[in-house]
């Protein structure tokens, strides 16, 4: 016995809420393909992202701490996998399409540069007069054109609903009108959940990594009311455990509290606003009503916690020094390839006439891992 494609579709529909995005409502693909016998469209999207070259490179790209400082801290891939896990959990609990949320989550950081946000900042500056650079747009470029794995189309040919979920910011994107569609209808709930899962994941794991690195101390953390509340509860419940276990338990509890609040508040908003279909979600979006959000109480605490991390962790002198180093490497490589375009790999070089030298260099450098960028940089100095 096995489930046919039709069986799988019926099984999916039976488990989805009426306002979820089903496989039969995926928006189609830019290039027509024969449907798979045993995998639904968003499952195929997930697998295509997982097998992409850009995804493999994420394991050697900085999340917060430059890869060379240690291997026990999050990199861009481990962060992405954590976001995907949270997205699946939240989507499933709300009767949404977990395959769609997971696909969006797995693809959301494909466009990130080496050296984390420092890399994006310097590339954005270098490209400001040449079309700009922004990692969400770069993720779209990767899945729609840069990846070369299939004989019948460029990119990964993902479903339009998956692509819409990657459009986190209101920026122009050619050649499609997908962004206009998102502006008119808003993102799916599945897409909004992937966005919020990203925020939960990086906030929680940055606390853990910052504490492990010695940049955050319990005294510092206790200055934040949200952390202090959770930590004191854990301390009261687990009186005989050591500090390391207690801190990690508090981080898990913090994550769980945000996830639970998000699920409960979205459920409340769906009920309060009598959401019965995706059309209802579109109507509410146009009215400025956002269904996917934390409760006011947790949202306020979460904002304070993120500001606390900005002040106490992200602006730490060691991280600033790491960021400055990353910017120096990328700026040096960019300048080198501008002067020596013949050194650009053929797979990129062949696009220069079509897309400009600046854009091709931006694509090439943005796609590098930290250690590959460092290797080239060191060979030039």
Swiss-Prot record:
Please report the stretch or stretches of sequence annotated as the HD domain.
76-203
Q: Does the keyword Hydrolase apply?
A: yes
**Could you tell me which CDD domains the record lists for this protein?**
HDc
Pfam families listed in its UniProt record: HD, HD_assoc
Q: Does the keyword Membrane apply?
A: no
Q: Which UniProt keywords apply?
A: Hydrolase
Against PROSITE patterns, the record matches this protein to:
HD
InterPro entries reported in the protein's UniProt record: dGTPase (IPR006261), Diverse_Catalytic_Enzymes (IPR051094), dNTPase_2 (IPR023023), HD/PDEase_dom (IPR003607), HD_domain (IPR006674), PHydrolase_assoc_dom (IPR026875)
Question: Which Gene Ontology MF annotations are present?
Answer: triphosphoric monoester hydrolase activity
**Coiled-coil stretches, from where to where?**
none
Q: Which family does it belong to?
A: Belongs to the dGTPase family. Type 2 subfamily.
Output the HAMAP family linked to this UniProt entry: dGTPase_type2 (MF_01212)
Q: What is this protein called?
A: Deoxyguanosinetriphosphate triphosphohydrolase-like protein
- Species for this entry: Leptospira borgpetersenii serovar Hardjo-bovis (strain JB197)
